[in-house]
Amino acid sequence: ITLCYQLKGDGTRAISQAKVGDKLSVLLPLGNGFDLGDAKKIAVIGGGVGVFPLAAVVDEYAGERQFTSYIGFRGIEYACLTKRFERAGKLIVSTDDGSMGFKGNAVQTFLSDYEEDKFDLIISCGPPVMLRALKTALKERKIPTRCLVSLEERMGCGIGACLVCVCKKTDGHNARVCKDGPVFEIGEVEL
């Protein structure tokens, strides 16, 4: 098992202080994953630490599916996993400051490269601002491609009881990201 995290609070700080050989207690698996269905041509749009779950998907299906990955970071010092995405298919990197790849973000690079019928499916994970931009762009440009997003939410219990990770759905109901997600159809959740 590989744990990837970004220092955000006491929990990730404690993980960062663990040493080789230390024992950690984990509760896995939680929620659902990306269901690629019959899709063969897949756009992967990731930002920041959101690239980690996407890398797992491209690793699992490399050779079986055609991936074009658009991944973005704040700057070159935050860039990671690029070789894994390259092994799985085409990779386009962007950074907010232009220190690596294109200057801009992953959604912008996807939109500049998009052609009708190029993809059967879009999968994405990243900060809420990125997912909102993607949802808006898909709607404004009338891009009909199915899009699945994995939400980054703070999770307490991991089993849906504490309600720390609740998100609003477009039907007016709530969803527990740890149990009902973290992967949702982009039109199913408020971002």
Language-model segments: which ranges?
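Ferredoxin-reductase
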Residues: 1-20
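Loop/turn positions that initiate beta-strands
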Residues: 20-21, 162
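Generic structural signal for buried aliphatic residues
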Residues: 23-27
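Short, Lys/Arg- and Gly-enriched loop/turn segments at beta-strand edges
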Residues: 31-40
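Conserved beta-strand elements of the Class I
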Residues: 42-45
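Short glycine/serine/threonine-rich phosphate/pyrophosphate-binding segments
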Residues: 51-57, 130-131
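Conserved S-adenosyl-L-methionine
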Residues: 60-67
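Reductase modules of NAD(P)H-dependent flavoproteins
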Residues: 74-191
